[in-house]
Amino acid sequence: MRRNQTLNKRPNAQKIGIYANICHQGYNCVKNANDETNPNMSNAALIVAAGRGTRAGGEVPKQWRKIAGQPVIAHTLQAFAAHPSISYVVLVLHPDDLHLVPNIEGLIVTTGGVARSDSVKLGLQAIPPGTKTVLIHDVARPCVTDQTITNIIAALETADGAAPALPVTDALWTGAGGIVTGTQDRNGLFRAQTPQGFKLDAITAAHAAFVGVAADDVEVARAAGITVAIVDGDEDNLKITLPADFARAEQILERRNGH
């Protein structure tokens, strides 16, 4: 096992926290060695943040742009780090971004791969032994609430997978060349969100066996035969994708903070 180290021991890097690790493929990483034998340390959050987010525009990747006084990534990490039922937070970063890690004590950091699925696999490998469940979350959803996290964890008590979603309420069209070509029945259709939660062993095996490109981790899970429960989603839990999304996310966060 690689010796624990904090980011402030690395040149040109910021400190994560006294139990933080920089993890790389082939090494085990733990927040605190004593936690490995603690049966209550059972839920981990895996934040996928290795992408470049070009559709959002800007000079830096979207996770590093500031909203409501902090980078997007800081809001997302704090939502999970502050939750009483989350034992570990694993952050998957692009190698070029390691020097930008926020100062959050106990954060476990690993580098990502070429595709999102590669980054998730590397993040799963960095989760400490003994962890029972993992909540996989897009870094670009900084408005996730305690209640959503709680609901996913509660659903995993009886299900192998659980994810938040909102039913589609708008009319749906098909189209080509700027022309409406048909309509789509919206019954039974949902807008998927994250965090998507799973039993750790099951989703790790599912990712190892999956071949191809998946839209999200629910697709990977279902391909492995995992049943995924639908939990109520939240309209405020938007994913920052386009430039206009930054202003909306900032409004949501400032409203919660009483601004």
Task: Give the ranges of each region predicted by the language model.
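Acidic helix N-cap motif at the loop->helix transition within catalytic regions
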Residues: 97-102
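Hydrophobic helical membrane-anchoring modules
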Residues: 237-259
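Residue-level signal for inorganic ion chemistry
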Residues: 47, 73, 123, 137-138, ...
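Conserved core of the sugar-phosphate nucleotidyltransferase
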Residues: 83, 143-231, 259
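Short phosphate-binding loop-to-helix
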Residues: 103-133
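N-terminal glycine-rich phosphate-binding loop and ensuing alpha1 helix
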Residues: 40-96
